[in-house]
Amino acid sequence: MKDRVLAAFPDLTAHTQGREVLLALKHEIGDVLKEAKDKDSEAQHLAKAANIVRRDILQIKNSFNGTFEPECQRNAIPASLKTLISMIIKGPTTKIDPADSQTCLTVSQLVVFNSVSRVRDRPDSTGSTHHIRARECPLPIYAALKIHGTTRDKSLIETFYKLGICISYDRLLSISTEITNSVIGRYEREGVVCPSKLREGLFTTAAVDNIDHNPSSISAHDSFHGTAISLVQHPNTEERGNDRATDVFDPTKSSTSKKIAQLPSSYSEVPPVALPSGQLRVPETTGQLISQHQASSNSESDREIDWLDNAKELLSKEELNKSDFISWAAYCASKSSLPSHEPAIISLLPMFFENAHSLAMIAHSMKVIKSAVQHINPSQIPVIAVDQPLFALAKQIQWILGEIYNEDQYVIMLGGLHIEMAAFKMLGKWLTCSGWAESLCNAGVATQGVADSFLAASHLTRTRRAHQVTAASLNLLMSKGYEEYLAKVDDNQQVKSFQEWKEDSQRKSPQFLYWAGVLDLQLCCLKLVRAFREANFSMYVNAIKQILPWFFALDHPNYARWLSVHYRDMCELPGKHPHVHAQFCKGSFVVHKTKRCFSSIALDHVHEQVNAGVKGEGGAVGLTENPAALRRWMVAGPELARMVEEFEGNISSAEDHHHHEQKHGFQSAFAKDVKSLISSYEEMGNPFTDEGLELIAIHTKDVMDAAVVSSVQTVSKIGEEQFNTFVKERFVDRSKLITDPLKKNNLPTFSTQGKKILSKDKAKVEILKEDCALFSRLYIACQSRDGNLEEFFKYENQPWPPSLSQMGSLRGGQKADLVKCLPNLSTTNTESPKVDAVILDGAVIVQMLPPKTALTFEEYFDAVFAPYVMKQLESVIRVDLVWDVYVSDSLKRSAREKRGSGQRRKVFPSTRIPSDWKGFLRVDQNKDELFKFLANKVRTMTT
């Protein structure tokens, strides 16, 4: 009893007197009464404030019509509630804040959403709040839309609904149904499928691609591979377009139906298309292609060179200032003027169930896009961006079907994002096994797995940054190479300029030529990206022209063929479609999602982002097995994604016009990576100081054979010749079909070098085939000349006797058989004689002493070879070392060839020892260099 009383009255204290307990007040009775009075007064104030706010809340009549207006959050809550919440969060103040914080708006909306006019006090009450539509605020609706779009998880939405954070799942389905049916009704009335957010009178482009959903549920039996079409409008300060009505449904007409109406049949039904069999030949090309093709060599000033000079200057600083921009994107953004464009208007059309990789779907997509574009901008030629496989289908439709699909009616573009990805993959193929990925790993720029992924351009943004770091590093390494050259020049010698030194070094050193070519190719790829970011159409066309020969040389036939067609189309654009060309020159061939500098992206890039927003991270579990749910997602998905974008656009803070890389932390990290990569290259050997005639993998010091060196020296010439021949034969003369196979070069590279050795069985088969052909010719000749067949095999008919040799190599004997023939004349002696000097066979010692834990050749000598030699000096006065000499015409040459061959590797003190030690010793040049290295080290030993 005492404990319960004390818990109820905390101001009381207990005093024990014998068996009795006395309860008394801690303080004076007056203070207690005053405190009780004050609490009653505060309770009255709170009650008055609550009544005022509740009165205003209950008068709120919200209605959601399918759009989030810019001031929808502020208009959905009463001013009294907003003021009270602001005072609670920030404290009472006389300062008026015109911009309410999002925190204040969020709490206020949740209060309104969870408010009830009266409390239901029933025994069967579950405690959940009953929400009415009149007090539905934008935030709970947005929360449900966001969760559904991201996870598509009903239970998660219901959990947050019970917490009072979002609307229920049933209400979400009701909204999606009303929106979808209202949108479809509008499409029926207008006779065309064209989203209401698009404006009239604006230049409009489109993108088409697959949209794939692979169900992750173990009970799923199917997947979705449909087609998505997005429309993009390009407003600017001069042309903003005319708004169309955006209310997508009437909130006063509530409906409980969850049934989705059907789309217009003219849109949803894809008619079949069949192409007549025939030769696929490119239409006649105007003279503008030739002039553009020839004039494109006169490139404009390259900002990439200025960036490299700027990076070299900034790397000499110990610490960067906040105004120093060393990364490529930040530097280019600092040199770009503020854009005059407005953020693009992007809308996704209802999706199709049909796969995009079909002639019928591509032809239907072209019709759908043309109808929508002409509805809002009647005089415009439709512009459609697609990936490479769809581009090939679209061009076939244009060239074979013609009429309403021909090149006068449509402009088909190859997606810029896919061109960039293909370019970096091609660059990765050229860099494979060169040591580039290992250099990035050793520098700490990336882990080995991530560095290897750069070769395949698995993550485009990371890959692009890695090449930027590499380009800045290679440029500085080349400058250091030139400084070393200047230090070696005598006073009486003429000093070469940097350009003269570079050209001379490229002619002499394959190593210099390879890495200088890598730098040029990286800058070419960055120039393509800069054309997108700056919306520079002429630079875009020139960058494509510079990259195309590499696709031919490195055997990328699909992009070599169809990117050439795209290049042809862009060159013909000024004469064939001058209005489209004028818009492209204004920057409308890319998408400006924000007002940030140097941030425009390609059409197919923004289409991929829109697709990702519709699909979310939850996949399409259960959709493909439910036709109604699938149709709801196909039609309502774009509209729900549009509403989420509207809400998030309203809550975004004041837009920053600076590029996202123009931050001091990003620049410091970039400079650190460049310095680390330079150190990594210098540890392995600066490729621009190598004056040798060999091409070496910098990480392993493996020496490439002559075929790889020839590839490095001729790759540019081969690509240019094949590209020029392709343009002449397919576009100008039209003597060949566009689908005729391209010549495959199979150029040996770092990853493919090495000669193939025929097995014994295959070698025997080759010899038998040669003998059979030879005998046939000799037999026929003998008969025609009345020869004596009895003497047919009297003479040798091969350059070497088959009984003594095979494929030009002497047949070897068995040493064990020779040992048996030697007489046993000497006696066995188990004790070593006492001598003053010994002669050691260095080659035998190397074969006998494996590297064990030694990592480099320096460590091998210090930890393995030298201790063995010093051990011999303990019992003798003098030790002599002799080494093998490998003569090209030695009798043992064939025996060594039978043992196989390993990888050629340069021997330097810091060179890592190969894992295959036996294979390394099978190469005569490796042993020559290793023996010389060990002999020179032995000469410097002190006893």
Give short role names for the model-derived ranges.
Residues 1, 5, 25, 49, ...:
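Alpha-helical interaction elements in eukaryotic regulators
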Residues 3, 10, 16-399, 536:
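Long, structured protein-protein interaction/assembly regions in large complexes
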Residues 7, 56-58, 63-73, 82-96, ...:
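Noncatalytic, typically N-terminal accessory segments of nucleic acid-processing enzymes
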Residues 174-176, 189, 220-225, 397-404, ...:
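Short secondary-structure boundary/capping segments
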Residues 197-201, 374-380, 405-408, 831-833, ...:
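Short helix-terminating capping/connector loops at secondary-structure junctions
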Residues 200-208, 212-220, 224, 402, ...:
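Surface-exposed, charged/polar loop-rich segments
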Residues 205-208, 381-387, 411-416, 838-840, ...:
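Extended hydrophobic secondary-structure segments that form protein cores and membrane-embedded regions
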Residues 214-215, 390-394, 420-423, 846-847, ...:
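Flexible loop/turn segments at secondary-structure boundaries
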